[in-house]
UniProtKB/Swiss-Prot annotation:
It is found in: Nucleus. Disulfide bonds: none annotated. Residues 90-180 form the K-box domain. Coiled coil: none annotated. The gene is MADS7. Probable transcription factor. May be involved in the control of flowering time. CDD domains: MADS_MEF2_like (cd00265). Keywords: Developmental protein, Differentiation, DNA-binding, Flowering, Nucleus, Transcription, Transcription regulation. Its main location: nucleus. This is MADS-box transcription factor 7. The lineage of its organism: Eukaryota, Viridiplantae, Streptophyta, Embryophyta, Tracheophyta. It comes from Oryza sativa subsp. japonica (Rice). GO terms for cellular component: nucleus. May interact with the K-box of MADS6. May interact with MADS13 and MADS18.
Length: 249
């Protein structure tokens, strides 16, 4: 069964009246909060109990501003409210413009002072403050420049190390290549010389009395040009025995 209809009249029982007030008050505050959140509405709720105790809820940070807004909308005509709102917006825009204009003028004056212009109107304290500001700016510029130089130097050193390492690797590969190539040339030369020596040892020319004779020197391949020493001695003795001068009879 559904809930029965409650007759709207004052509850005579004091306890029941207080309990009903607490329940309905909490429900009303909850509904006001839900309305402000779900519908993005500006809600203000004011409740006074029969004893004069205040209960309130405001969706904004200030209940006073909401009440002032309510008064302007309630006690002024629609045209007056629109005019007041436009006037307030124009006033706020003008104030913002004046603030920005003053700030721009101040910045321009400071820039001219930093460039050394319009210094006659400055006092001693202002000049000292300007000098400190320039010193601080100069120090910051020098620090930044030094940092950039150090970073560039570090990068150059890193690149130099990379190039040096690459050069060492190339030099090592070149030395290894030259060593391997020299070893191959040496082995080919040894094989070629050994191949040419074998026929001379096995088949000597002219029965061992030829013009070219191999010499054994600790296994090293050598080549002797001409007749051996004993062959020269035999030839000299033969010439001396057979040669006769023309004046002999």
């Amino acid at each position: 069964m559904g809930r029965g209809r409650v007759e709207l009249k004052r509850i005579e029982n004091k306890i029941n009246r207080q309990v009903t007030f607490a329940k309905r008050r909490n429900g009303l505050l909850k509904k006001a909060y839900e309305l402000s959140v779900l519908c993005d509405a500006e809600v203000a709720l004011i409740i006074f109990s029969n004893r004069g105790k205040l209960y309130e809820f405001c969706s904004t940070q200030s209940m006073t501003k909401t009440l002032e807004k309510y008064q302007k909308c309630s006690y002024a005509g629609p045209e007056t409210a629109v005019q007041n709102r436009e006037s307030e917006q124009l006033k706020a825009s003008r104030n913002e413009y004046l603030k920005l204009k003053a700030r721009v003028e101040n910045l321009q004056r400071t820039q001219r002072n930093l460039l050394g212009e319009d210094l006659d109107s400055l006092g001693i304290k202002e000049l000292e403050s300007l000098e400190k500001q320039l010193d601080s700016s100069l120090k910051h510029v020098r620090t930044t420049r030094t940092k950039h130089l150090v970073d560039q130097l570090t990068e150059l050193q890193r690149k130099e190390q990379m190039v040096s390492e690459a050069n060492r690797c190339l030099r090592r590969k070149l030395e290894e290549s030259n060593h391997v190539r020299g070893q191959q040339v040496w082995e080919q030369g040894c094989n070629l010389i050994g191949y040419e020596r074998q026929p001379e040892v096995q088949q000597p020319l002219h029965g061992g009395n030829g013009f070219f004779h191999p010499l054994d020197a600790a296994g090293e391949p050598t080549l002797q040009i001409g007749y051996p020493a004993e062959h020269h001695e035999a030839m000299n003795s033969a010439c001396m025995n057979t040669y006769m001068p023309p004046w002999l009879p």
